[in-house]
């Protein structure tokens, strides 16, 4: 039976997976200060917790993350992480950070171009109802990239319909609204792309640590000729 499963003849089935997980988490945390990559990932994780107003004690959250390993619904998916090294996660993180900064620079340039387009057309920002449209671009230039705050309004519809100026404003360029619409929609696509990258980036560190815990669990079980009850089943 053991031979068929390619496990030690005298293997021990571990019923208390919490103890096994605790040891794996302690080993992962213990690498802080020894391994530069682990140190960076653990520090990033702790800083994320502080930013979310959670306790800086990462042990509790690592245990919570680690329990996903013993859920049979996750087993097949998590095994696919085994071939990924910690450095690969960090490379992806750095790549996404660069892409995010590039997007931020691009949308700032486009939003600035929108304001210039308005002023070059001989218009004042006060010519727009409540200055909503100019303020929209000003928010982006100021670093507001929240889709909820930027796009929970009728600005796009107004641009499509050409209803962007006060009724008292006459002789505005006919092509102003269509031009601004192109800028608006281009920026919108980039803002949502940035949001996607940010969400992926937020999950890279937890995934990297989950992978590290999974590898430590395997090492521990091989050292002690053990098999967790979830794997045995």
Regions found by a protein language model. Give the residues of each.
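Conserved ATP-dependent motor core of P-loop NTPases, especially the RecA-like helicase ATPase domain
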Residues: 1-143, 223
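Coupling/switch/interface segments within P-loop NTPase motor domains and analogous charged loops
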Residues: 34-48, 127-215
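Accessory N-terminal region flanking or inserted into the helicase ATPase core
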Residues: 3-10, 21, 75-98, 175-233
């Amino acid at each position: 039976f053991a031979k068929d499963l390619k496990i030690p003849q005298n293997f021990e089935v571990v019923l208390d997976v919490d103890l096994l997980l605790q040891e794996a988490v302690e080993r992962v945390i213990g690498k802080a200060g020894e391994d530069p990559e682990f140190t960076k990932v653990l520090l990033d994780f702790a800083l994320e917790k502080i930013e979310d107003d959670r306790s800086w004690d990462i042990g509790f959250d690592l245990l919570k993350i680690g329990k996903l390993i013993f859920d049979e619904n996750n087993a097949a998916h998590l095994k696919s992480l085994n071939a990924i090294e910690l450095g690969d996660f960090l490379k992806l993180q750095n790549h996404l950070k660069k892409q995010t900064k590039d997007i931020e620079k691009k949308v700032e340039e486009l939003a600035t171009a929108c304001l210039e387009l308005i002023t070059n057309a001989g218009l004042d920002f006060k010519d727009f109802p409540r200055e909503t449209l100019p303020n929209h671009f000003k928010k982006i230039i100021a670093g507001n990239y929240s889709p909820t705050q930027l796009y929970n309004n009728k600005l796009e519809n107004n641009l499509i319909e050409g209803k962007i100026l006060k009724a008292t404003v006459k002789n505005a360029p006919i092509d102003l609204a269509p031009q601004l619409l192109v800028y608006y929609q281009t920026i919108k696509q980039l803002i949502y792309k940035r949001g996607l990258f940010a969400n992926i980036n937020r999950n890279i560190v937890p995934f990297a640590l989950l992978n590290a815990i999974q590898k430590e669990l395997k090492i521990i079980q091989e050292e002690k000729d053990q098999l967790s009850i979830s794997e045995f089943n």
